Amino acid sequence: MIQRRNFIKTGIAGTTSMALGSILPASCKSETSSNAAQKIKVDLPRPITAMTEEYLGIKPLNLYGGYEEMMQKMRSYRPLDLNAVEWRKANPNKDYSEWARQARERLLSGLHYNLPPVNLQAQTLETVETDSFIREKIEFNSTPWFRVPGYFYIPKNVPLPAPALIVMHAWGGPMLFGADRICGEPVHPAIVNHRAETSSGRPLADWYASKGYAVIVIDAFHFGNRAPRGINGLPNSYDPSKLDNDTHLDYESRANGALHYGIRELNWAGTTWAGINYGDDSRCVDYLLSRKEVDDNRIGCTGLSGGGWRTNMIAALEPRVKATVTVGWMTTSDSQQAYNVNGAVNTFCMLPGVWDRIDIPDMISMASPKACMVVSGTEDILFPPVGKMEAARQISETYLWAGNPTLFRNYTPAKPHCYDQEIQEEALIWFNKHLKK
């Protein structure tokens, strides 16, 4: 009879070897069982760049201590390199459309979120009318398990159907508020402060509606009316607009503390945070197409920070959107991992098996022929200068390869992490050029 200790040494090891042998690439497999115990040498298809302060253009914020070298090696070994620039070098006889198809399939499959058919069952709950627009408080089904709250704007004084924008709130800021951050009169001092810091005090959705756009804004998962309740010390029911400052800060801390729990729950359920966000955002297009006030062929998308990330996803994967403006979320994966993961990369970015195959700029690169503008403030310290510059270079090169060099713009104002009045005006020019012609 096999002793338990020997079984652990031989049985499990042998089983593990067989299992790994069936999934590892040929370069990682040992040739014979006699050298199975020898150290496996992995060829790294990409050279490892030393992510120094000089290279990054800024001092790294959170190097992973003794694990840093291991992380860089892990990133350098690409099981499948679908970065546009690298793929083109390796496949000189293939065209842009083939790369974009493969990259898009990888990104979409990595979301692990298949949207089932659903009846939106949209409702308008209340209406506010101004001189420039009508704002409706709405809700609709994005899936059989999510009913999404938000706002829809009908512009006045313009011919209908009008062009439309999906406007996305940021990740950073008061988590107990989502769409309300950028819609309507501020319902809490936290919103006043957030707007002052990010949008020159303007409610962004109201402003775009006043410029002649139909607009939809929703609460992202874990924000606003979808913020945590009944967990981590949060009550089952509360109205964030009625919280005093101390209670609001306490609830904000508790909601943020539930993030790690949420990502584990979602992954265990077989999906990703990014998948839920993209699913909800894609359903916003369905909602827009259900409205007679919207021109189906003139839909755009924009957002700051986490909203900029979601805009990247829409640019990459949603064919019904024709123009985008990403504000405050563009870099390269390698430089970001070395510089600042903790401050910029959150649950909405987590896609195992994706970012070691494609890169962040590839989301915009695969969007051609959409008209895409990326805004990267030179004073935005969430991202390293080299990451922002290299991302723009890759996207420009890929749009040229796709035959649409004029449909990409990289705008680099001397701004911090914001979507202020100057950026708003530049974004409006971009949307007017591509959605109002």
Language model features: what each stretch is:
Residues 145-147, 156-164:
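Proline/glycine-enriched tight loop/beta-turn segments at coil->beta junctions
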Residues 6-27:
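N-terminal export signals
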Residues 22-60:
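C-terminal segment of N-terminal export signals and the immediately downstream linker at the start
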